[in-house]
Amino acid sequence: MELSPREKDKLLIFTAALLAERRKARGLKLNYPEAVAFITAAIMEGARDGKTVAELMGYGATLLTRDDVMEGVPEMIPEIQVEATFPDGTKLVTVHQPIP
């Protein structure tokens, strides 16, 4: 199976997000890479489902709370930018303060 670098990146994000989802379900607090992957994957899937950029910008800030992540993680993530594939092309989604 031949994958482009972009496809490899998407697969890596998905894998990290799946791990983060499982850890969160077990009650563990997420670290920085897990939190970023969790939010990024949700944004990418939302784009695939046909949500708008504006919807995803708001949605991205509702996925995790301070209680879901380790101390200091919210301050490490002032914003997340995701290049997501929408039905009408690729667009940049920026989520400001993703962990309020």
UniProtKB/Swiss-Prot annotation:
Catalysed reaction equations from the record: urea + 2 H2O + H(+) = hydrogencarbonate + 2 NH4(+)
Pathway in which the depicted protein is active: Nitrogen metabolism; urea degradation; CO(2) and NH(3) from urea (urease route): step 1/1
Keywords, ordered alphabetically: Cytoplasm, Hydrolase
First-tier enzyme category under EC: hydrolase
UniProt-annotated location(s): Cytoplasm
Disulfide-bond pairs as recorded: none
A GO-annotated cellular component: cytoplasm
GO annotation, biological process: urea catabolic process
GO molecular function annotation: nickel cation binding; urease activity
EC number, UniProt record: 3.5.1.5
Protein family per UniProt: Belongs to the urease gamma subunit family.
Quaternary data: Heterotrimer of UreA (gamma), UreB (beta) and UreC (alpha) subunits. Three heterotrimers associate to form the active enzyme.
HAMAP family to which the protein is assigned, alphabetical: Urease_gamma
Protein name as catalogued: Urease subunit gamma
Organism per entry: Methylobacillus flagellatus (strain ATCC 51484 / DSM 6875 / VKM B-1610 / KT)
High-level lineage: Bacteria, Pseudomonadati, Pseudomonadota, Betaproteobacteria, Nitrosomonadales
